[in-house]
Amino acid sequence: MKKTIISAMILIGGCLSAAAGDIFVSATRGNDRAQGTADAPLQTIEQALKQAREWRRLADRRTEGGIFIKVESGTYRPIKPIYVRPEDSGTKASPTVIQGCQGADVVISGGTAVTGWRRGCDDTRLPAGVRARVWVADAPLREGRIVETRQLWADGRKALRASLFGKDKMQRMKAFDVSDESITIPTPSVDLSRADRLEMTVHQRWAIAILRVREMKDLGNGLTKVFFRQPESRIEFAHPWPQPVIDGERGSSSFALTNALELLDEPGEWYQDYPSGRIYYYPEEGKDPNKMNIVVPSQEELMIIDGTRERPISNLRFENLRFEHSAWLRPSLEGHVTLQGGFRFIDGYKLPVAGLFHKAELENQAWIARPEAAVKARFATDIAFSDCRFEHIGATALDLEYAVSSSDITACVFEDIGGTAIMAGYFGEDGFETHIPYSPAVRDDLCRCLEISRCRINDAANEDWGCVAIGAGYVSDTKIVHNEVSNVNYSGICVGWGWTALESGMRNNSITDNHVHDYARQLYDAGGIYTLSNQPGSVITRNRISAPYPAPYATNHRAFCIYFDEATDGFTVTDNDMVKGSFGYNKPGPSMVIKE
């Protein structure tokens, strides 16, 4: 008996202490028909939320001091996103808290293991010299469907999709022709005539485009014309900003070809065939995939905090949780052409006659959509994430979308993020022309009184290079303070949207005491700190910012420690530690106070 009790204590670990409002969860020893006590825990976080919801509905006295969902170490794989609803709200005196037990490693994962690897492949699309070294596995199934993926992690490292030029390597294009929607490139050294899932990644100033290749025509002079699938082809050649540059001050824009079995020729690369779903992997010398932890993501969203305007969610805490292995699949379905910051075009084009009611010189219009996110919140107040980790994420990691207020992200770590690590605020998406100033009729629709502090963000925007570490759009009274940002392919900390000098909801924002380094690694027109539009009462102070990284394929030199992009106004900028003369300006307003 004593041995049994000791074993149970070891299993429970940091969850031994219990109070009336505690609900216990264990992936390994739990049962969703249990009582949720320390010795009879539930198995899923979803069931714990349901139990907490019932306590609140029935005004159970156990809620008086707060509900604490205490989660033991383990990997939790929700079959759909974990939904948190208005009925899960707490109060200031009785919050709802989802927390990993002290010292626990609680992983909320969208990943699925790839197993059953077989060595050797005689597929003639593979380069002959690597056929004996490539391993093949069937795609995992999720609820009876093949998992289609653009991401694969091998022993915790994101593997490279098969590419013509290798990791982060590109080649300069020769022509960009709007008339027939084509890009002319040097003829590839590999026969790609059977590569029906081939993609071209296009480097275009401050953003990228991912275009699915429809056809390649050899022009016979060392050049090849490439045509693309719809809808991305129309969008790529219609929108004016940003488009590729031909013969710029640092050369023409660059491209990479990816996602063909013919290109699988380097250790660490992989490819998924379609429609079979088979996954091909070329491991490093001496590695056996059957002895490795190889994971693909099977869902894009891990948690949705989903309030409404009429019934916002409130008083929730998330502590000591790890979110990992979320997917980003959209480019495989319809390509990916972005305006800025990872926001893809729904439509965009040059105006034949310039001018809109609010901006006489505007010569283009654009309608955009928000990137996917692993964890997102909308219509919520008094929400807090603390001591959480976000790793191996396909798109955005954590997004405070709409009408989120009085909420904090504190001491969280973001590592290996395909898109933006932290996003907050409206960005003029979902039918709202993106250059029109946003000033909501209902003030509470604006994201406000947010604080992002003491977070560490490394290796963000590693899949969509045009994303950022921290991106805040239409926000007010928001503090971004004491964060470290490193290794990001575009800008570090970005605040503002709209390219407008007009008043909107943006004001009283503070970017203070942050350390930003190793940014602008691939794209320029960037800043360690980057701002847009009029934001009265805002400050940028005491930040430490290194010089921009020398991006190898940028077509100009426009990258700065602090970049005041179009119509930035209302900021007081003082006491920042950076290279002298490292400000960039694009039509700043008259109310800027800048002290170098």
Task: Name these PLM-found stretches.
Residues 24-379, 384, 430-441:
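Extracellular polysaccharide-degrading/modifying enzymes targeting complex plant/algal/animal polysaccharides
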Residues 63-69, 94-96, 450, 467-468, ...:
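Residue-level recognition of the N-termini of beta-strands and the immediately preceding loop/turn
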Residues 58, 80-81, 300, 327-333, ...:
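Short glycine/acidic-rich loop motifs that flank beta-strands on beta-rich extracellular proteins
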Residues 314-325, 361, 381-395, 404-419, ...:
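Right-handed parallel beta-helix
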Residues 70, 77, 83, 97-99, ...:
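Extracellular beta-strand solenoid repeats
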Residues 18-21:
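Boundary at the C-terminal end of the N-terminal hydrophobic targeting segment
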Residues 4-14:
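Sec-dependent N-terminal signal peptides
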